[in-house]
């Protein structure tokens, strides 16, 4: 989907082929919600929610997003984020969305902050990129209008 420079800014392997993404979509698990952005039949971005399956974490999901370098800064990332957050808020009723991002990825951090994410932690030397250890930020967003548990299932 994207050149190695794009995946260098993620915690994924730098050379995922299209076959890997096709396989991931074919073997999609019930707790995963993938999304792709296309322009004229070309995949220019992908994103997804990975909902937690543990009972005490069922209110949360991990978010991941990647946009092709040539399409960054053109609203693709914002469109993917908007769609995922709408799904999380209005369809899954999730309270908490979490993500990790390299601390020097200013463009992504700006997008996440504009979508309501806040920094919760810094993981020192957490990721390996081009032979160097780099810090990772843990960011999260809480539902703007948290859903309530039904009275019969509240603790």
What is the predicted role of each segment?
Residues 74, 78-79, 90, 103-121:
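Conserved active-site alpha-helix within GNAT-family acetyltransferase domains
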Residues 10-70, 81-82, 87, 142-146, ...:
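Acetyl-CoA-dependent GNAT
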Residues 36, 48, 62-66, 75, ...:
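Conserved beta-strand segments that form the floor/walls of ligand-binding pockets within enzyme
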Residues 81, 88-100:
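Conserved GNAT acetyl-CoA-binding A-motif
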Residues 32, 134-138:
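Short hydrophobic/aromatic beta-strand or adjacent loop that forms the aromatic wall/cage
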Residues 59, 93, 133-135:
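Residue-level preference for beta-strand/loop junctions
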Residues 1-12:
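Helix-loop element at the rim of GNAT/NAT acetyltransferase active sites that forms part
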Residues 96-101, 113, 118-134:
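Conserved catalytic-core motifs of GNAT/GCN5-like acyltransferases
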């Amino acid at each position: 989907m994207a050149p190695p420079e794009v995946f260098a800014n993620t915690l994924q392997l730098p050379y995922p082929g299209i076959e890997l993404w096709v396989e991931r979509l074919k073997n999609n698990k019930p707790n995963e919600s993938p999304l792709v952005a296309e322009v004229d039949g070309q995949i220019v971005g992908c994103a997804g929610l990975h909902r937690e399956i543990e009972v005490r974490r069922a209110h949360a999901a991990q978010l991941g997003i990647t946009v092709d370098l040539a399409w960054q800064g053109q609203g693709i990332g914002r469109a993917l984020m908007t769609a995922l957050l709408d799904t999380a808020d209005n369809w899954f009723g999730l309270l908490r969305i979490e993500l990790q991002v390299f601390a020097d990825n200013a463009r992504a951090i700006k997008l996440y902050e504009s979508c309501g994410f806040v920094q919760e932690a810094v993981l020192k030397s957490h990721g390996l990129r081009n032979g160097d250890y780099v810090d990772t930020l843990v960011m999260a967003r809480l539902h703007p209008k948290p859903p309530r548990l039904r009275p019969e299932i509240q603790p």
